[in-house]
C-alpha cells in the first residue's frame, strides 16, 4: 500500500513540476509568435516574385509614398515605445495606401490576389498591434505629413519596401512589446 501511495505521490509531483516548470521560461503568447510574421514575409516575397515575372499590366501608374525601412539600432533603442509604435503604424498605413493604389493600377488580374493578400496581412499586423495594447494610429490628412518616407515608382520596389518593413521595424516592435517578453522566473 505504501509503495502504491509513493508512486502516486511521485507521479503527482512530476505532473506539478511539469506544469509549473519552475526554471523554464513561459511560452510566448500566440500573437507574439514570430512564425506568423515570417509567414507574412514569405507571402510578400511570393508576391514580389510574381510581380517580377509579370510582363504586362503590372506597373504603378504613379509613384507612391512608402515608409523608410532602414533602422539605426542605437536610435531605435532610444525612442519611446509610443514613438516606435507611431512609426510602425504610420508605415503600415502608408503601405496599405500604396497597395490600394497599386490594386487600381495593376490590370493583370492574376496579381490582384497577391495584392489583396498583402493588404490583409497588413491589417492582421495592425490587429496584432492592437491586441498588444499599442495605441491606435490616426492617419493624417495627407501621406506627405508623415516623416521618414520616400517615393517608389515601381510595384517591385513597393513589394521590396513591404518585405523590408516587416523584417525590420515590425519585427522589432513585436520583439520589444511588453506582452511578448519571455518571463524567466
Swiss-Prot record:
It is found in: Secreted. Residues 1-25 form the signal peptide. One of its GO terms (biological process) is erythrocyte maturation. Expressed mainly in heart, liver and brain. Isoform 2 is brain specific. Erythropoietin is the principal hormone involved in the regulation of erythrocyte differentiation and the maintenance of a physiological level of circulating erythrocyte mass. One of its GO terms (cellular component) is perinuclear region of cytoplasm. Belongs to the EPO/TPO family. This is Erythropoietin. It holds the Pfam family EPO_TPO. Its main location: secreted. Disulfide bonds join 32-180, 54-58. GO terms for molecular function: cytokine activity; erythropoietin receptor binding; hormone activity. InterPro entries: 4_helix_cytokine-like_core, EPO_TPO, Erythroptn. Keywords: Disulfide bond, Erythrocyte maturation, Hormone, Secreted, Signal.
